[in-house]
Structures are given as C-alpha cells and as structure tokens.
C-alpha cells in the first residue's frame, strides 16, 4: 500500500497492465521520452521500450485512428490526448470507427481502446485546456465514459478500462492530479465500470457528482451536517453507462436530488439524470430536482476562473434551497 496522487495512480495502473499483458501499448504526444505532458507515463518507455510506448506526431486524428488499427489487429492501445479539448480532431475516428466497429462487424471485430485525457478547469489554462465535454461522448452508442475522483478510483477504474473489450473514454480531472493523496494498493483488482459509489450515507438529500467536483461536494456535505442536513453523496464514476439503479434507490430514500457538475448545464449529464429520476421516481420526490452546473460559456482566463468554478458554498446554498422548496 502506498500513499500516492491521482497522477501516480494512473501511472501505476499503466505499469501494472503493461507488465500483465504484452498486448497493451501506449501512444500519444510526448508519452515516451518525456513521460507525457503531466508525466502520467513517466518510466514506461525505459521499462517497456519504444515499440510499446510510442511518441506520435502532433496529430490527434492520427492518434485516434492508429489506435483503432492497433485494436483491430489484437493490441490493446491506451491513447493519450494531452487535453480533452484536443480530442476534437480525432472525433471522426472515435465515433465513426472505434465506437461502431463491434456493431459494423456484428461482433467479429472489437476495439479494446482506452482514450485518456486530462479534463476540466481549475489549472489557470485557457479553454482548449479546460474543457468538460463528457456529455458529448456519453451521447455516442458504443462508448463508455469514465471519470475517476480519487487515486484509488483512478487505479481500479483504469485497470478495468484497459481490460474492457470496447472503447473507453477515460477523463482524468487535472485539477486534482497532484492536490490530494490516498492509499492505493497495487493488487491488480479493477473496479466495475457500471456502478456509482456511495461516499457518504444520508437521509435528507441525494447529491450526485463526479471528478474534481466530488471534493467540493464532500466539504459541503460536512458543512451541511453541522446544520443537521444529512447528504447522501454518490460518486458517479462511470458516466456511461449510468448506474440509475443506485441513483433511484438513493432518491427514493431521501426524496431530493441535487446533481453537481463542472460542465455547462444545457443538454448535459445532469439533465439526463434529472429526466430519468423524474420519469421513474416522480412520486418519491419531495421537491423538484436541481442541477448546479457550469455556465453555458467557454472557460474564462485564469483571472476570472474562480467565478466559473463551483464552490462548496454554492453547493451548500443549493442544498438549502432544495430543503426549503416543496411541491405545491
């Protein structure tokens, strides 16, 4: 057991799977000699060689497409994009090739690919380096979308993503890459890619979040507990497929739902969760569900970034509004 950052946990998972399975390869810009833009792949090339840790040109479409070719020929590529906002040139390959290969070939050919990238605001970077567009990929049939919120989750979820027979979008919240540490056991045990995790039980309010927002949610839950408001906190972890069973069970217990995410609110994952809860558990609700999201705008430059990010006080205020708001 080691105390490590989320970034170190990602690196550990990559090491583990490359040792376990010789078909696992890593590719991307600067992933080899330099160990990646955030050093997530540091040490891999020295240990596994240039044939399994491949530096690519600055061409995201190429990275996405080469990964498809590798996967269809029996390899298990882990392709890194330096930031989520850089994935867009590779969208055609991801959506039209990787996501549809199993269906197109009636299951004869699959694409066991992990597309990794950091995502989110909070590191004083402009918009291409601060995107939160997980909803775009969650809309695509054939893709899994996974977002860890802690080092332990990052390790276990990445192991399972690499072992999955279909393409997985694995988005890592760069805001907490190095800002937190927790114990991680290199036991090779993956976490399921179809369940959310209950981080805190509660009776009054269900709060669903993922990624870096979990840190603010947990702090807000502690603050609210001092005011005798007990929040049940669910870490979604896997955006697609949604673990609606766990969400619905929690909402039926608490009667209230707050969804918190950094991405803009319109047509987002929060809207999908609220719609599903309203369809399937309307009579259990004591108040209308609420979303607390980013604004419908590009992430601002760093001087105004603090006004864009959701704080624990924002979450606490939203929780109070839910507790005070009742159906007419």
Regions from the PLM with identified roles:
Residues 1-167, 171, 176, 307, ...:
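Thiamine diphosphate
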